[in-house]
């Protein structure tokens, strides 16, 4: 799995001063948060899949569930067209959820079992035509990389943050502001993190520190739970720095910080890790520096 080895650039620590959302009407109604979208493994809908089961009942919602048991390592491979994602899969029978993040098309789902040091054999395969309800579905619910549920502490925290928000842009600003001020970059963790690491939004919230992968996962969890589509993206900043950041979509225009204004009905890239490290907004907003490799 992916390893984020970015380093925070800039000289400040947590001294960035983003503004709250651009609330101009004190009499505006509070933002109405839509129903919580969960990822649920439907036992009645699941079918045999190699040494486990696969739930394909939520394809239009942009998510699948898989669980399997094995004495060896397992991987889940998802292919659509020329794109391919490989994930580690727990071998203890616990359900894990994966996004259908390659748009509409014919998907191939493969369960892979380790047969050598770096060799895997396919022990289960399913093909399905996928038509999503809309492009936002995969980025509105939990998955392996953005792992949370309705009872998660990070979801309780964002409920506190949204109390005075009247638009989705206000909520995005509140989450951005909270994370920049309260989550510190963990340089020790960045130097020792192992390949295959999975972020825990609640752990990041609890410890108040993390690497770029942690920042991006926590932000995505908070925003998704509020009905705001949010991608967790990994790739390169410049030519050598492997990094993680977010892209979110709001229906209302509004200030995210004093220098960043989100446009309505457009995807907006944000890099909270670098913002927390004091990097100037002009550098963070330079899209030419960012190259996407994977999206979750």
Predicted features, each with a name:
Residues 2-167, 255-258, 287, 291-296:
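N-terminal accessory/pre-domain segments preceding catalytic cores
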Residues 52-54, 188-194, 212-213, 217:
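Short N-terminal helix-initiation segments at or just after the protein's N-terminus
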Residues 144-207, 256, 265, 270-278, ...:
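Secondary-structure boundary elements
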Residues 171-175, 208-223:
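Active-site nucleophilic cysteine motif
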Residues 190, 198, 209, 232-239:
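Catalytic cysteine-centered active-site loop
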Residues 214-296:
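Hydrophobic/aromatic-rich core segments of domains that either
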């Amino acid at each position: 799995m992916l390893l984020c080895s970015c380093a925070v650039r800039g000289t400040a620590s947590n001294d960035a001063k983003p503004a709250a959302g651009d609330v101009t009407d004190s009499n505006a109604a509070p933002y109405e948060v839509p129903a919580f979208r969960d990822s649920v493994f439907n036992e009645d809908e699941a079918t045999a899949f190699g040494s486990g089961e696969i739930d394909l009942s939520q394809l239009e919602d942009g998510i699948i569930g898989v669980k399997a048991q094995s004495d060896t390592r397992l991987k889940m491979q998802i292919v659509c067209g020329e794109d391919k994602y490989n994930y580690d899969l727990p071998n203890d029978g616990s359900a894990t959820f994966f996004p259908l993040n390659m748009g509409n098309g014919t998907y191939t789902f493969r369960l892979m079992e380790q047969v050598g040091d770096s060799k895997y054999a396919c022990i289960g395969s399913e093909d399905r035509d996928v038509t999503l309800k809309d492009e936002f579905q995969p980025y509105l619910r939990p998955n392996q990389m953005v792992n949370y549920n309705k009872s998660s502490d990070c979801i309780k925290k964002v409920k506190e943050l949204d109390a005075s928000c009247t638009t989705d842009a206000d909520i995005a600003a509140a989450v951005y502001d909270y994370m920049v001020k309260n989550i510190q970059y963990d340089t020790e963790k960045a130097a020792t993190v192992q390949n295959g690491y999975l972020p825990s939004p609640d752990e990041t919230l609890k410890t108040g520190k993390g690497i770029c992968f942690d920042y991006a996962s926590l932000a995505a969890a908070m925003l998704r739970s509020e009905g705001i589509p949010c991608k967790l993206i990994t790739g390169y900043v410049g030519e050598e720095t492997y990094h993680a950041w977010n892209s979110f979509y709001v229906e209302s225009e509004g200030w995210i910080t004093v220098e960043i204004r989100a446009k309505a009905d457009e995807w907006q890239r944000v890099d909270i890790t670098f913002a927390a490290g004091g990097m100037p907004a002009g550098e963070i907003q330079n899209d030419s520096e960012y190259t996407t490799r994977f999206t979750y």
